[in-house]
Amino acid sequence: MSVAFRRDSDEEHLEPKFEIPIPAGPNMVTQRGLALIQAKVAELEAALPLIEDEAHIVATKRDLRYWRARQATAQLAPAADGDIVEFGCSVRFRRNGKEQLVTLVGHDEAEPASGLISFSAPLSQALMRAEVGDFIAFGGQEDAIEILAITATDRS
């Protein structure tokens, strides 16, 4: 029989399942970020025994491996003093005439729509080590960002 008429198994046509990629570099976290990771591990561990669908079990185990790795490698950042822009600080700045407020956090805690941006994001990298009153380059423009305020966030 021609191979054109051979029925392949359904398994051959499934998308491969890969591990969730772990961001490169250190796993810096705020106290809030560490609590979020711990809560996610606890949630997945509690859910796993209750799952009956094999595909869902496989996906949950994959997620659990990711979050356990993130928990094991988490490095709680030292408290910032708010004098300069550092990991964990909130920064109010003006760019293109518009004021914005962002907080520099770990990869797993980042929610850009809520103003929580990863410390490795280009904007975070541009802001790092700046002081109030500084003008910094960003997006190929000199003096694109003016630092208006820096606040150390609570790490307790």
Placement of each model-derived feature along the sequence:
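Helix-rich terminal scaffold detector
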Residues: M1-R70
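Short, Lys/Arg-enriched charge-dense amphipathic segments
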Residues: V3, E15-P16, P21-I22, N27, ...
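Amphipathic alpha-helical coiled-coil segments
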Residues: R65-D81
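Non-DNA-binding regulatory cores of transcription-related proteins
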Residues: P78-L148
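Short, compositionally biased
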Residues: L148-S156
